Amino acid sequence: MIWLTLVFASLLSVAGQLCQKQATCFAAVNKRRKHIVLWLGLALACLGLAMVLWLLVLQNVPVGIAYPMLSLNFVWVTLAAVKLWHEPVSLRHWCGLAFIIGGIVILGSTV
């Protein structure tokens, strides 16, 4: 159950980052303020809930194991950026993500 909580904390943190990015995207001049307030409000909500879940995780998992698992955020954000905003990703970046995933698998297998 706690590992599921960790995954949700990670995904909410990513959602918060994506909402911040969306707040910087173009909006019509007459809707710009609402656009920014909406997306930054969602970002704060996601990041706040992620923090609460993260505190629950830290009560049950050593920080030396739990914190590296948040490196999955790099993977989720990259995949979302490619899908949502068609951002380019270099081969070097993909290789880096593969190393991150490998590291998480190694660390996760020690628990």
UniProtKB/Swiss-Prot annotation:
Record has Transmembrane helix as a keyword: yes
Periplasmic-side segments: 57-60, 109-111
Family matches, as Pfam families: EamA
Membrane topology: Multi-pass membrane protein
Gene Ontology MF, one: carbohydrate derivative transmembrane transporter activity
GO terms for biological process, alphabetical: lipid A biosynthetic process; lipopolysaccharide biosynthetic process
Boundaries of every EamA domain copy: 40-109
Cellular component GO terms, alphabetical: plasma membrane
HAMAP family on file: Flippase_ArnE
Chain's role: Translocates 4-amino-4-deoxy-L-arabinose-phosphoundecaprenol (alpha-L-Ara4N-phosphoundecaprenol) from the cytoplasmic to the periplasmic side of the inner membrane.
PANTHER family: 4-AMINO-4-DEOXY-L-ARABINOSE-PHOSPHOUNDECAPRENOL FLIPPASE SUBUNIT ARNE-RELATED, SMR FAMILY PROTON-DEPENDENT DRUG EFFLUX TRANSPORTER SUGE
Family: Belongs to the ArnE family.
Protein name: Probable 4-amino-4-deoxy-L-arabinose-phosphoundecaprenol flippase subunit ArnE
Organism: Escherichia coli O81 (strain ED1a)
Originating gene: arnE
